[in-house]
Amino acid sequence: YDEGRAATVLEAGDYVVRAGASSRDTTPAAVVHLAETAVVRELHDVLGDPGFTDWRPAAPAAVEAPAGAPRLAVEPAALRRADGCEPVDLTDALEFVEKLSDDELSYMVLGDYRDGAESQSIIGSAAQTLVGAAGQSTSRFEGLPSLIMPDGPAGLRIAPRVGIDDDGAFALDSSMPAGFEELMDEESRGMFDSMMGVSDRPRTPKRLVEQYATAIPIGTAIAQSWSPELAEALGDLVGAEMDHFGAHLWLAPAFNLHRSILCGRDFEYLSEDPLLAGRVAAGITRGVQKHPGRGVTIKHFAFNNQETNRLNSCSHVSKRAARDLYLRSFEIVVREARPHAIMTSYNLLNGVHTSESAELLETVLRDEWGFEGLVMTDWVVAGMTRHDLKHPAATSAPTIKAGNELFMPGCETDRQGILSALRGQDEQVELSRSELEKQAARVVRMVWALAGS
């Protein structure tokens, strides 16, 4: 990425191509000559100021061209990529949402929360359909189904044992791994039990149902296979189980780059290499989405690299590093596999929450890459957020305005924030009716595509 031109380029010169079985065992295969610098893609100058200047060497390192290797010439024009991204047709979905009141529209862009349940993500009828799933889109509109969303990453994370009584279905066990809750304090444990669908009152099941799902290998293990075909087979398995359980969007795969062993998500974040991570995640995506009505939610978009203070931490990244490294794997998946959904990360990028960045969500993701799916937040639960730090947690109205269609899992505080911005009562952000309609229409379009009408 050339920051001066806001474009990806290949500079003029000779490129030595090496081939072999590993990085330690290669031989020169050819020398490719580029007579002049080629502009591969024209992009936008976005993503903010990191507050520092990238180090650049005084001069590029010179490598002697190997004798005897074939020499090939490439015309710069042949490397040009003109990606025409047609706007998604929202005509029918807009016609649906334009008839809704402001109050109804505000529900459309939130998860299907239960009134008064500020810390729950198993809400509405989700516990009746797939107990232990992380959440769902709204169920408040007749004739508009909900999108059911079980978490990942190692298969579908749902409650393995379900009890059914006169009030409906409920989880007998948490879908979190055994021992996980032992690391939490009592307040956090209660919040997570609530999120996972465990009843907060004594209930005696009249009938028991088992819904065990297959555990697939963790992300790093899949990536170590170097096999997009294996990844696709595992995605196919998950897609088949989504068919069985009636899930629509799997909240996986995740693939920010490994930078430090201290990142708590490295086990699912595939690789330190953007090409490998992108190709493996694309394989998983193709496997799941070969099943009609099933989709992945690639995450966490983007630049997340720590769990501590992750709702309020800021990643400072140069535009070149962002384009060449940290966004590259996401770009590969979007262009090659067309995922149905993407989840933003908690962190900020150069001072702006990724979930509140129109430059990231509209300019890069949709305008440059041609993403046509649904964008949702990571789960912003009231008990987890803090607003007294240098970087307060993200809130609903700026998130919706920026191009994030679903603020998850949603609560009444989030809805009132949207309505306040819509009425011009929020000093920080103003949300227009047309902006809210567009985001709601994107939700409706995906519901129709995956769950029908």
Walk through the language-model features, giving the residues of each.
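Short beta-strand elements
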Residues: 25-43
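Glycoside hydrolase catalytic-domain context in secreted enzymes
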Residues: 9-19, 23, 43-453
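Intrinsically disordered, low-complexity Pro/Gly/Ser/Thr-rich segments with frequent PxxP/GP/PP motifs
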Residues: 1-6
